[in-house]
């Protein structure tokens, strides 16, 4: 069996694709994959590090307002479709799956025009432009939030959840926090701002240092590589809390995730899939810079079920952040209730569900 996977730009599109690849390999040892992405996104380094063959194409996303740049984007899209058709004819895949980001536009569109079975996977509650466009041409649309189904042709929609959920649940044991310089047996908070970090979260963490020094819990604070030097310099000046460890990036995050009692971060789809699958309460700070403010919709779906505390970025400061963490951690009853609520929203068998969509498509294509 041969499968083409495409998705990129941010970790939220890439990591679900990798989790899906692992699931297919679990069922078919001889499967061959080709990952199509861009040179500029995070996908090239991440995918090649996993030893998966990678092909780069040149494509940019559409601006939501009319502009000359969109004319150039259309030209790149058409060129990308032509290039993808040639690559697909060469590779001869049994199916093509797009996991979001503008790069999968020409890939999945080209596959549909060649009559190759196609799936798109939408991680968010509000879909992006690329997946909305592709939904007209693909065979199946896999979703992770019920709210997303109204944006797609009803007969194509299948609720699968996010494959990353299955990946974190399947990890046996996990890694010890001592490897990161943290103590075992102590309540621990993970704070991070997504795959590229988030400056407003960093500012709030720096501002809460004096209060954090008085707490009996500990914090792992992942700044994002871009922000690391600036943050460590500010912490040195401010006086970092001794119960906090700072890292630029955590490559094996799924292997550590089970060890955390609370997660503080953005409301990206991958983060939500992981923490709900493991039943981890959270403080969610939706990014206001994403398409149609979809992270706030993601976050509210947890907040309304008492699985998370939702803080808007416009309201974020050091005091508000540490109060939100305290609300969860300093009352054992609240902590346990939120764990149960979070777990009830998880889809731990998401990767298998998505694999079953592929299997069914292949069966009907015969």
From Swiss-Prot:
UniProt catalytic activity: di-trans,octa-cis-undecaprenyl diphospho-N-acetyl-alpha-D-muramoyl-L-alanyl-D-glutamyl-meso-2,6-diaminopimeloyl-D-alanyl-D-alanine + UDP-N-acetyl-alpha-D-glucosamine = di-trans,octa-cis-undecaprenyl diphospho-[N-acetyl-alpha-D-glucosaminyl-(1->4)]-N-acetyl-alpha-D-muramoyl-L-alanyl-D-glutamyl-meso-2,6-diaminopimeloyl-D-alanyl-D-alanine + UDP + H(+)
GO CC list: plasma membrane
Pfam families in alphabetical order: Glyco_tran_28_C, Glyco_transf_28
Organism: Bacillus licheniformis (strain ATCC 14580 / DSM 13 / JCM 2505 / CCUG 7422 / NBRC 12200 / NCIMB 9375 / NCTC 10341 / NRRL NRS-1264 / Gibson 46)
Keyword Cell wall biogenesis/degradation: yes
GO molecular function: UDP-N-acetyl-D-glucosamine:N-acetylmuramoyl-L-alanyl-D-glutamyl-meso-2,6-diaminopimelyl-D-alanyl-D-alanine-diphosphoundecaprenol 4-beta-N-acetylglucosaminlytransferase activity; undecaprenyldiphospho-muramoylpentapeptide beta-N-acetylglucosaminyltransferase activity
Lineage: Bacteria, Bacillati, Bacillota, Bacilli, Bacillales
GO annotation (BP), single: cell wall organization
Domain of life: Bacteria
Protein name per its UniProtKB record: UDP-N-acetylglucosamine--N-acetylmuramyl-(pentapeptide) pyrophosphoryl-undecaprenol N-acetylglucosamine transferase
Gene3D superfamilies with a match to the protein in the record: Glycogen Phosphorylase B (3.40.50.2000)
